[in-house]
């Protein structure tokens, strides 16, 4: 006799679903779509290993009541809103054998619930829900085109809301949901908090959080004081010059002559002014032989010595009448 088909929530998600059900499980819906948490993950058994099956999920209204949270509890009233047929979301694995379906858990984590009907257009995984209504997930199994099994798990029902009303439920989901904003803040706070480690003694040491790494915008230059090769220093400071090929022989140095003060004075003698002795005030050199005073030699006749040795005789210049 063939084993009947059985559908249960997976062992990893069923305990959390039961815990949320104790607080009248609420599911937040948004305009942009929100994941269902806990995840709709099932374990299916009793399928024919060789037959082909396909599965889909839809969210069905539990009743025609609209809920309102007041006084710390939910109050019911008759819902007058229009109800559309529930939208079916097919599993992304499509059609496969019963062996493949039973090999692993069946998850519908691709479903997003929204409170805007237009979000369903062009988004196969989006499902529109009415706010403050009670829903229950329904898993349907098809063999070809024939419906063979429908599963409704009572403690998986929830109330669609735009914000949590019970703090205990909010804390429970935040601490277990990896996609929750509060859960991310808690994990970030844990990473930034000091880490306590026990050593050999009874005292506990606190290790500070790691400092932020600062990226250097420019590479650090080496210590030039330890560079012994000048060519290497030149290549670091002037890379364009270092690329030019260098010859092995340096150019010859200019000849160096010893310092000669007499030679230097002889070279500067034509440019020197006449030197006057002290205290007479007469020039110590012949002013008539100075090259700078050559224009004045025609104004002063040069004395001549007479042949008879009687002394110096000045010859008057001859004047020519014109």
Curated annotation (Swiss-Prot):
Primary site of residence: nucleus
Keyword field: DNA-binding, Nucleus, Transcription, Transcription regulation
Domain of life: Eukaryota
Residues spanning the signal sequence: none
GO MF term set: DNA-binding transcription factor activity, RNA polymerase II-specific; RNA polymerase II cis-regulatory region sequence-specific DNA binding
GO BP: cell fate specification; positive regulation of DNA-templated transcription; regulation of transcription by RNA polymerase II
Gene3D superfamilies: Transcription factor, T-box (2.60.40.820)
Key word Manganese present: no
Location in or out of the cell: Nucleus
Keyword DNA-binding: yes
Example of a GO cellular component annotation carried by this entry: nucleus
DNA-binding span(s): 16-185
Record region (Disordered): 171-214
Pfam families per UniProt: T-box
Compositional bias of kind Polar residues: 171-182
The protein, known as: Putative T-box protein 11
Gene for this chain: tbx-11
């Amino acid at each position: 006799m063939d084993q009947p088909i059985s559908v249960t929530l997976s062992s990893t998600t069923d305990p959390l679903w039961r815990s949320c059900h104790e607080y009248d499980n609420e599911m937040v819906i948004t305009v942009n779509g929100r994941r269902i948490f806990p995840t709709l993950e099932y374990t299916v058994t009793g399928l024919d290993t060789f037959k082909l099956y396909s599965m889909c999920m839809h969210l069905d209204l539990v009743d025609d009541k609209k809920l309102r949270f007041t006084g710390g509890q939910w109050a019911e009233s008759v819902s007058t809103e229009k109800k559309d047929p529930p939208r079916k979301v097919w599993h992304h694995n499509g059609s496969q054998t019963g062996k493949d379906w039973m090999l692993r858990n069946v998850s519908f984590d691709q479903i997003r619930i929204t409170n805007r009907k237009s979000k369903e257009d062009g988004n196969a995984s989006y499902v529109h829900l009415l706010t403050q209504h009670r829903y229950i997930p329904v898993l349907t199994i098809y063999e070809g085109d024939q419906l063979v099994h429908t599963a409704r798990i009572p403690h998986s029902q929830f109330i669609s809301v735009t914000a949590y009303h019970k703090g205990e439920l909010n804390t429970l989901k935040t601490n277990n949901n990896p996609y929750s904003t509060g859960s991310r803040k808690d994990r970030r706070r844990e990473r930034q908090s000091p880490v306590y480690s026990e050593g050999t003694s009874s005292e506990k040491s606190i290790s500070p959080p790691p400092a932020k790494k600062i990226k250097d915008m420019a590479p650090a230059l080496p210590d030039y004081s330890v560079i012994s090769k000048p060519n290497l220093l030149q290549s670091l400071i002037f890379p364009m010059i270092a690329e030019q090929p260098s010859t092995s022989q340096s150019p010859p140095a200019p000849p160096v002559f010893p310092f000669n003060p007499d030679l230097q004075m002889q070279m500067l003698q034509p440019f020197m002014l006449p030197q006057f002795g002290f205290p007479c005030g007469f020039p110590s050199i012949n002013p008539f032989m100075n090259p700078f005073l050559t224009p004045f030699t025609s104004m002063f006749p040069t004395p001549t010595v007479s042949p008879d040795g009687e002394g110096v005789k000045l010859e008057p210049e001859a004047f020519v009448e014109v």
